[in-house]
A protein has these predicted regions:
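N-terminal subdomain of nucleotide-sugar transferases
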Residues: 1-58, 67-70
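Short hydrophobic beta-strand element within catalytic cores of glycosyltransferases
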Residues: 348-351
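Short alpha-helical donor nucleotide-sugar binding micro-motif in glycosyltransferases
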Residues: 96, 310, 318-323
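Membrane-proximal helix-turn-helix segments that form the acceptor-binding/catalytic region
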Residues: 151-188
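Conserved acidic donor-binding segment of nucleotide-sugar-dependent glycosyltransferases
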Residues: 363-364, 368-375, 384-389
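Aromatic "clamp/platform" in nucleotide-sugar-dependent glycosyltransferases that forms part
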Residues: 331
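Nucleotide-activated donor-binding/catalytic signature segment of Leloir-type glycosyltransferases, i.e.
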Residues: 280-310
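Conserved donor-binding/catalytic core segment of Leloir-type glycosyltransferases
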Residues: 8, 226-245, 251-258, 266-267
């Protein structure tokens, strides 16, 4: 065994500590990889190189960060994620020749550059993919529980971009083709749930699966939901800007909940689609947003729905803690980070029974599961939480216990490092 493991990570976005050094804004993503890279950077037995898209430049960027880690930011000639960019393979070949990794660890399969790295490295036994969402499977569920007219119609923005809901699903399927080829070409995959195990084995029966969870954002490991401090009869949903997240199902359930709790309030993280007024806002609006706004107005839910705007990590944490119940209404999820964050804080959860949710939630013990196309059952379970505070407290307590085991940072690091060592020994 070598004294030091040279590992190259391929990530979908620049991690925060690198973006700060490059003085670029890359949004709020990559938090757990920021934590993991910081841990690896401080270890004497790891030499780390991170590779990620650098969309702010036209040339290959190369810097050092932390104590001794390296970063390469690669440009793209083609920015549409459903089109394969051959030039990326050439750039990766150059990076690989310079860094000379023992192992390549690819985070996510959602973009074609995953396949580019698999092809460029061309060493299946020393390549491991860390699946997040599995886009080839997700594509099949993209339009779930939507009427056909909503799937096929266009807003002005959709027409110009050729990007209505049906076309979005087609693009997911195209991206899924690159994902499938990448998974077929590697020997090792990190997974988190029974669902992703089934999907990955269906793609590549010979693959070696290794279990490793993801760390959650740091602030979610502190603070605990308290029934007495929450806003009674309030619901929180962390995303709703595209069909997979099931906001249309949540709104249908909200109609029923309102019959029993007229003051119920649904908080939705993200931009406020109820106040689209300027010409610029109107021409940039998707048909799904227009559809959601129409449902809210038609079902007389305007006073019961509030869009929070984009939330920072701390504001998101506070929104969880203030809520009476957290809902995940997705038509498919692998291992929802939003559910994980709610679990760590102990916020009572009602989730659709889809994908990998049963690897996180045991119905009636540390959450409630409803049939994904049954908004009346979602409404029923929300009301169960509202009317039974002892049950809500019990669920919240069990969630924290489960989450502390699943998202233990030291255990996650141990699992990843052990897998690296096993890969080097074969």
């Amino acid at each position: 065994m070598k004294d030091k493991i040279r590992v190259l990570w391929l990530c979908n976005a620049i991690i925060p500590q690198v973006s700060e050094k490059l003085n670029v804004n890359t949004g709020t993503g990559g938090g757990w990889l920021n934590q993991l890279s910081d841990i690896f950077d401080k270890r004497d037995d790891i030499e780390l190189c991170i590779v990620a898209p650098f969309l702010q430049g036209d040339e290959l960027a190369h810097i050092t960060f932390g104590n001794k880690s390296e970063f390469y930011g690669f440009p793209k000639k083609i920015h549409e994620p459903w089109i394969y960019d051959d030039s990326v393979e050439e750039v990766f070949a150059k990076i690989l020749a310079e860094f000379k990794p023992d192992l390549v660890h690819i985070f996510g399969t959602e973009f074609p550059h995953t396949l580019s790295m698999v092809r460029a490295f061309n060493n299946p036994d020393k390549t491991i993919i860390h699946v997040q969402g599995i886009i080839s499977a997700i594509a099949k569920h993209y339009t779930a529980f939507l009427p056909e007219k909503a799937v096929k119609r266009y807003s002005f923005r959709d027409f110009i971009k050729r990007d209505n809901i049906e076309e979005q699903q087609d693009k997911f399927a195209l991206r899924g083709e690159y994902e499938i080829e990448a998974i077929k070409k590697v020997r090792h995959v990190f997974h988190r749930t029974e669902w992703d195990e089934a999907v990955i084995k269906g793609i590549n029966p010979a693959v070696c699966l290794h279990y490793a969870q993801e760390m959650m954002r740091g602030s979610f490991y502190s603070g605990t939901w308290n029934y007495e401090d929450c806003e009674k009869y309030s619901i929180f949903i962390s995303q709703g800007n595209y069909p997979l997240k099931g906001l249309h199902i949540m709104l249908e359930a909200l109609r029923s909940v309102k019959e029993l709790y007229s003051g119920v309030k649904l908080y939705i993280a993200g931009d406020d689609i109820l106040t689209v007024s300027s010409f610029k806002e109107k021409i940039r609006e998707s048909y799904y947003s227009k559809y959601i706004r129409r449902l809210i107005i038609e079902w007389d839910l305007t006073d019961n729905v509030e869009f929070t705007g984009p939330l920072s990590e701390e504001k998101m944490r506070q929104r969880y803690l203030k809520s009476n119940v957290f809902v995940s209404a997705s038509s498919i999820e692998n291992s929802s980070n939003s559910v994980a964050e709610a679990m760590l804080l102990g916020v009572p959860i009602v989730s659709s029974f889809v994908g990998g949710c049963t690897s996180l939630i045991e119905h009636g013990v540390n959450g409630l599961l409803y049939q994904a196309d049954a908004p009346y059952m979602l409404a029923y379970y929300i009301c169960e939480i509202f009317q039974n505070k002892d049950f809500a407290k019990s669920i919240g307590k069990k969630e924290v216990e489960k989450a502390r085991m699943l998202y233990d940072k030291e255990l996650i690091v141990e699992n990843i490092l052990q897998t690296y060592k096993e890969m080097l020994e074969t």
